[in-house]
């Protein structure tokens, strides 16, 4: 029996493919960037055909790099940028418009009107999401209303909608299968996370014809066989999950109270709440963590707009550092008791503040303040914002006992220690940092028998380093109080 798994990791700026073995070890990788389109202010688009072409290219390259044949694969897992919306012609397979990306804000005014008309409570109750351009529903309606004849063709069943996973599945299987998984469906604002069905009332609210929608499967399932000409053999696509959900799986956060936080340009914190779909009273999102054997596991999620991007700004905008690794050296000279606060609200503040009008600020400056203090404040801002999320999660009644971290900033020991100190929980950094792709491989492996159980996957997770809290409670409280004061000033500017 073959023990290799191919993970497709289709992201916002690049498509990647990674081959893993049956121990979760990386065997080969390939990556290719693709174009971003910004036709108007606040609009972000992708060419869906370019996404497909780049994905196929990296799959072939990864197999070639690892000297592995497609016939050596037990299965394929797909993980993807969430919410991004593609609509295509079922007969020709051609998109009728560029894909509208999750970052796109073109439907903001309609979302505002829907909220003002009192519809948000329905959306929160059924989907766990807020009414926001971020999610797929209003993007779908925009395409139907702005491409000639699209709405009529959609109602006649001639068109198909999909998030990126569905689009890739359609192409990999030669147009035979129009399917998605429960995690991606849960990000559309059209899927009832309690009934695990597309919701007729939400379809009516957002004016989306049911004929457009894919069939919803478990996250580990037989989605369909690839066409032989794609990779050289027919391979079962056996797992699908949105990127943050796949990272939760890759981090083996399978028990309620387990959480992972991914530190890239921004930050996504997701906490497993088990069989309970916990409704947030603090404007966090409730989502499907994954669905296995027909049983959904739920999570609560908070997002920070600026994490690693704060260090990019200090490097490229202010030129205070020439490389991100210098930041830890500066922080070591300043220490944790830094009176300077950097609130990186460059595009407003995300969860739990949700203030689009907030703008960035550096507070606490004195004549003694130098580059080191400002750089350290940038690092600390990531940890303070994470504490904002954790506090909101706890206020919603969820437990958070430890935090597993991944992403670019997770390699910074100083930041991870300060994160543990300010949260007052252990912070665990895994040996394998490619957690998103690994999660997709795990799902495919569960379905194809490479992995027997979640317990086996849990046994494969290894901690490279655990950071434990080592800060006096009084200092922790005073530092965080200073942060809250800084945020209040920014929000009330």
Curated annotation (Swiss-Prot):
Sn-glycerol 3-phosphate binds at residues 12, 82-83, 134, 243. Pathway: Polyol metabolism; glycerol degradation via glycerol kinase pathway; sn-glycerol 3-phosphate from glycerol: step 1/1. It catalyses: glycerol + ATP = sn-glycerol 3-phosphate + ADP + H(+). Its EC number is 2.7.1.30. It is an enzyme of class 2 (transferase). GO terms for biological process: glycerol catabolic process; glycerol metabolic process; glycerol-3-phosphate metabolic process. PROSITE patterns: FGGY_KINASES_1. The keyword Transferase applies. ADP binds at residues 12, 16, 265, 308, 408, 412. Keywords: ATP-binding, Glycerol metabolism, Kinase, Nucleotide-binding, Transferase. This is Glycerol kinase. It comes from Marinobacter nauticus (strain ATCC 700491 / DSM 11845 / VT8) (Marinobacter aquaeolei).
């Amino acid at each position: 029996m073959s023990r290799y798994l191919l993970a497709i990791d289709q992201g916002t700026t690049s498509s990647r493919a990674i081959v893993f073995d049956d121990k979760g070890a990386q065997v080969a990788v390939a990556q290719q960037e693709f174009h971003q389109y910004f036709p108007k202010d606040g609009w972000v688009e992708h060419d869906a055909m370019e996404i497909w072409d780049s994905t196929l290219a990296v799959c072939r390259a990864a197999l070639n790099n690892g000297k592995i044949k497609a016939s050596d694969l037990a299965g394929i897992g797909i993980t993807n940028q969430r919410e991004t919306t593609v609509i295509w012609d079922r007969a020709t397979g051609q998109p009728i418009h560029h894909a509208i990306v999750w970052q796109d804000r073109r439907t903001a005014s309609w979302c505002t009107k829907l909220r003002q008309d009192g519809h948000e409570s329905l959306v929160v109750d059924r989907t766990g999401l807020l009414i926001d351009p971020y999610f797929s529903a209003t993007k779908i309606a925009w395409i139907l209303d702005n491409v000639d004849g699209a709405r009529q063709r959609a109602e006649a069943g001639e068109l198909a909608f999909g998030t990126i996973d569905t689009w890739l599945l359609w192409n990999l299987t030669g147009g035979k299968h129009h399917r998605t998984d429960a995690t991606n469906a849960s990000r559309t604002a059209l899927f009832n996370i309690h009934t695990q069905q597309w919701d007729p009332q939400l379809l009516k609210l957002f004016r989306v014809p049911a004929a457009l929608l894919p069939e919803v499967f478990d996250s580990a399932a037989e989605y369909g066989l690839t066409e032989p000409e794609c990779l050289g053999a027919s391979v079962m696509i056996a797992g699908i999950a949105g990127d943050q959900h796949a990272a939760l799986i890759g981090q083996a956060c399978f028990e309620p109270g387990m959480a992972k936080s991914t530190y890239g340009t921004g930050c996504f914190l997701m906490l497993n709440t088990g069989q309970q779909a916990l409704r947030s009273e603090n404007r966090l999102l409730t989502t499907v963590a994954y669905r296995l054997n027909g049983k959904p596991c739920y999570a609560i999620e908070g997002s920070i707009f600026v994490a690693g991007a704060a260090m990019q700004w200090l490097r490229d905008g202010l030129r205070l550092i020439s490389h991100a690794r210098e930041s830890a050296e500066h922080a070591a000279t300043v220490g944790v008791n830094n009176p300077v606060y950097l609130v990186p609200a460059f595009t407003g503040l995300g969860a739990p503040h949700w203030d689009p009008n907030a703008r960035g600020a550096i507070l606490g400056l004195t004549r003694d303040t130098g580059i080191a203090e400002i750089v350290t404040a940038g690092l600390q801002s990531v940890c303070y914002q994470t504490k904002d999320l954790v506090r909101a999660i706890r206020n919603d009644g969820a437990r958070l006992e430890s935090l597993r971290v991944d992403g670019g900033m997770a390699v910074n020991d100083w930041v991870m220690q300060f994160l543990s100190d300010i949260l007052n929980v252990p912070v665990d950094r895994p040996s394998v940092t490619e957690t998103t792709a690994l999660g997709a491989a795990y799902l495919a492996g569960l379905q194809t028998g490479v992995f027997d159980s979640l317990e086996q996957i849990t046994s494969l997770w290894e901690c490279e380093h655990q950071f434990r809290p080592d800060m006096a409670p009084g200092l922790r409280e005073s530092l965080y109080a200073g942060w809250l004061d800084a945020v209040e000033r920014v929000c009330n500017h």
